Design a protein with these regions (language model features):
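Gly/Pro/Ser/Thr-rich low-complexity, intrinsically disordered segments predominantly at protein N-termini
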Residues: 1-196
Length: 196
């Protein structure tokens, strides 16, 4: 007897939203596939929390920091994505079909993990960079003191990598952020975890 492999049907966005409302974990919607997001390590979670503190203290004007629960709709690619943090300036803009998603982040932050780094600095970055509102896309390593910032300047994307001893600026913030402040009491200067 031959076994038949049944592939799941592609979901539509309404299916995705229904699943998100009852799920205990977050999912992204990519090309009709509902993809579960992995939980973070101790370092990942502490770095994400530290970024919330550092960015929240530097908010200016109508700009505000949003944690990892904020969903984004990438209209040009029909995708629902999450980030580890973001800054939205002005009122959040919501697509008609999803009142919980926004479409206008100014800055998106991802804390890299081995399982997500390829996507975070690849297809996911490209998805977010397709948003007209996005001015910076930030990748924060969790295994070394390193921050990579993609910035849009006059319609073109450039990238700068910052290491221990450097500081970096982001649009919308009142002051620069020292890389060392992100990792304080989390990683030592060699990248060794201080949490173990």
């Amino acid at each position: 007897m031959q076994a038949t492999l049944r592939l799941p049907r592609r979901a539509n966005y309404a299916d995705y939203l229904a699943a998100e409302q009852t799920s205990e974990c977050r999912h992204e919607f990519i090309d009709g596939v509902i993809v579960a997001m992995a939980g973070g390590s101790d370092e990942h979670n502490r770095i994400t929390g530290r970024l919330a503190q550092l960015l929240g203290r530097r908010e200016t004007g109508s700009c505000g920091y949003y944690p990892s629960d904020q969903r984004f709709w990438i209209a040009s690619r029909a995708r629902g994505r999450y980030s580890d943090g973001s800054i939205i300036c002005g009122p959040p803009e919501h697509p008609a079909h999803d009142a919980q998603a926004t479409t206008n982040p100014t800055v998106v932050i991802e804390v890299l993990s081995p399982s997500s780094e390829g996507d975070d600095d690849g297809e996911k970055r490209s998805d977010f960079q397709s948003l007209a509102s996005l001015e910076a896309y930030v990748l924060v390593a969790q295994d070394q003191r390193r921050v990579k910032v993609y910035r849009r300047t006059e319609g073109e994307w450039g990238v700068t990598t910052y290491r221990d001893g450097d500081s970096f600026e982001l649009p919308t913030l009142s002051s620069s952020i020292p890389v060392a402040d992100i990792y304080e009491r989390i990683l030592d200067s060699t990248g060794k975890s201080l949490l173990r």
